[in-house]
Structure formats: C-alpha cells, structure tokens
Amino acid sequence: EARPIPGTDGAVDPFFSPDGQWLGFFAGGKLKKVSVNGGAAITLGDATSPRGASWGSLGTIAFSPSALSPLQQVPDAGGASQPLTHLDKGENTNRLPEFLPGGRALLFTAGMAVPAMLTNAQIAVQSATGERRNLIPGGAHPRYAPSGHLVYAQGANLMAVPFDPQRLAVAGAAVPVVEGVVQSPATGATQYSISTTGSLVYVAGGVQGTQRKLVWVARNGKEEPLAAPPHAYQNPRLSPDGRRIAVSIAEQETQAWLYDLSRDTLS
C-alpha cells in the first residue's frame, strides 16, 4: 500500500537510512531528511542541482550537491558539510555515491559533465583513508550487492562483476544482469536499487531521450524544424517582434537562452 509522506513536496532522489526509519531526499535546493512515520522534514545542507546520495551505517550521508562538483559529506544528525572526494584531472563531477558495508569506503561515478551528457564516465572507489582507485571505465551508478558483486549501469544495461569489499578490487569478468533499464544520459542515474537481502528492483526501459528540436508549427499542423541544435528545450516564448525565441535549456543546470531567428544563433 502506497502512502504519501508529509513534508516531502517536490522531493527527488529519495534514499533510506540504514535502519529504514528515515528517508533522505532533495527538495528546494536542499538536502533533507524526514521520519517515515511522519513529522517535520529536517534540512541538512545545500544541494542546488543534486546528483545522488547515500546514507552510511556510521551516521554520514554522502551526496553530490551540484552537477559540477566533488562529493560532500554531512552528519545525519546535522552539522556542517565537508568535502569527501576530490576531482581528478579530466573530470568535473563526482556523483551517484554508494557506501560499502561498514560505512567507510565509498563507490561513486566520476566523469566529465557536458550539456545533456555525462562523458568519460567511470566507476571509482574511495577507501576510508581517502585513497581513490578507478575500477570500471564506461560504467555508471554503482551499487554493492550482498552476493559480493558490484552492480553498475552500462548502456542502459545492468552489469555485475565480483567485488572484494575488503581489498576494494574487482575480481573477474563482468556479466550482464538485466537488459534495458531506464537511464538518464545527462546524469548517468539509472532506475534500480538493491536491498540488503539481495533483491533487485528496476524500471524497464532504456536511455531516456532529452534532446529536442525547436520547430515552427503552421495552422494546418505542418512542422518546420529550426536550425537550432538539439537540446533539452523547455517553455519556448516568441518575442513581440517575432525575431527571437526565449527558451529554457534543462541540462546540467536549467538556464534561459535566446535564439536569434535571423542569425540562427543561440546565446
């Protein structure tokens, strides 16, 4: 039976506390938590454009506060956020964290975020001492399965590879687990989860299309594409003189742009 949880209006990216009694989420540019039994939501930190979070067994929440940032950490009881990871050369984002058993080591996705796409993605692990090791090139959104496997997304498919959580190393070849899982090309986020008992739940589908074209639509319904390049366009508005189009592009950050119809330029 599904029921709404008060205090979670506008919530995205929900995640449970290790004991299942609290729900973490993002809303209104903030990281928050709320009891599953009800009560007021508690703000834990700022997160203007979040890219995932994980609640560790030692009372720490790892989270990505924005599309272009390393990971941060905050005590689940509240307090100041602190840096958790550092960006390596050639990347501008660490995101989609997953604490390993014990709550000290951490899996995450690293890469280069560009408009509407996460490129050069790879799965990395950081030890309790802060040492980083890159594990799987081309993978995203890792999760640890109690069977001793690292599960991750690659091309909207779920893959699994044997993983030693003590040595923080893969041990063997990856095999496909599920074909066709909903994945965002802009964030790498993939719609699946694994319970502590090993059950896997996912949303069937594939890579979501975020690219759209701007088009003129005549009164007879005929469409004529404009020369503007594809983007994640939203809410286009034509200027009073008919020469420009104001439009939002919702990619790494949602921003307003102007398309000049006479020059075919977007700025």
State each model region's role.
Residues 1-267:
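Acidic, proline/glycine-rich low-complexity intrinsically disordered segments
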